[in-house]
Amino acid sequence: MKAGKSERERSSRRRHRSGDALATVVVKQERLSPEPVAHRRPDAPAASPPPPAAESGSAGHRGSRARGASRSPAKKKSKSSGRRSKSPRTKRSRSPHYSTVKVKQEREDHPRRGREDRQHRELSEQEHRRARNSERDRHRGHARQRRSSDERPVSGQGRDRDSQILQAQEEERDFNNARRREHRQQNESAGAEAQEVIPRPAGNKNKEVPVKEKPSFELSGALLEDTNTFRGVVIKYSEPPEARIPKKRWRLYPFKNDEVLPVMYIHRQSAYLLGRHRRIADIPIDHPSCSKQHAVFQYRLVEYTRADGTVGRRVKPYIIDLGSGNGTFLNNKRIEPQRYYELKEKDVLKFGFSSREYVLLHESSDTSELDRKEDEDEEEEEEMVSDSS
């Protein structure tokens, strides 16, 4: 009897496990709630040992019913579940309940769902940003097209107007370049040589363009100052480009109060420096009122107009004051500093407060007056010698 009972329990457990496994598979695939298991009420009497022999009829009836139940797994399942109701809640079934499976699935799906939501949100933000950028670019393109269409003139009139604007710009540029070039040439030549001009084309008769300036390789600035040093002293004056050595033999006749001093020949150089600094001066002036570099006697090649109207060139003497303290006097008139003054035959020069006078003459000049003065001086000297004897 006990062996049959244990056998029935084992078979019912097997069926219960297979039924639970089947129910679990159905839950995972179809996600349906399992059929409710019929539990016996807690007040139901527990399984009692088999009745005595007096109730053998009813026991036999029950045994036949149990046999019938073994054929139908559903009834056996309810019996076995009822029999197992005594066990703790955690040991009722070894297979997980549907709610537990659902919780596990939700935990597994949660990170995937969060990742998908995040990706979807990022994609939507990127699409929104892209759409906004494309809309901004489209607005900019429309504005640019509108601006270009506003600036773009009508085809025929636009071409004419563009050509006129270009022509006017070229003319203005050429005119400005010509003015700058002319101004630069005037500054360099210091108004020495007249510049030849070339008339512009027939369209611009009122504007003239000077001859193209040739490059100048002469020293200037600090280099010129370094090269303009003589015997360790920096010379204040630099000769102009038109400086020339004269062919005519000019001379300076100095006088001190009526006394004739030795003649100075000044035709061997293009310039002569006059001053108190004997180390660098070509013509020293020892009077204390004179500056170390007082003035310069300069020969320049300049243009002049002949009697027949033609233009010629000639070397003429000039005097320039180097900004001396007490000035330079030409025919008893003080001249302006840093400015050339043309000298002529028989002009008289004085420097500072010195009493010496310098008369400018050349080899062809009439020196009869000077000879007469020299003769008078010699006669006076002879008379003085005879009186003393």
Curated annotation (Swiss-Prot):
GO cellular-component term (any): U2-type precatalytic spliceosome
Subcellular location: Nucleus
UniProt keyword annotation of Iron present: no
Stored InterPro entries: Cell_Proc_Reg/RNA_Proc, FHA_dom, SMAD_FHA_dom_sf
SMART domains: FHA
Any one GO molecular function term: mRNA binding
Any one of the GO BP annotations: miRNA processing
Post-translational modification: Degraded by the proteasome upon binding to the SMAD1/OAZ1/PSMB4 complex.
Complexes and interactors: Component of activated spliceosome complexes. Component of the minor spliceosome, which splices U12-type introns. Binds SMAD4 and CREBBP/EP300. Binds the SMAD1/OAZ1/PSMB4 complex. Interacts with DROSHA and SMARCA4. Component of the SNARP complex which consists at least of SNIP1, SNW1, THRAP3, BCLAF1 and PNN.
Name this protein carries in UniProt: Smad nuclear interacting protein 1
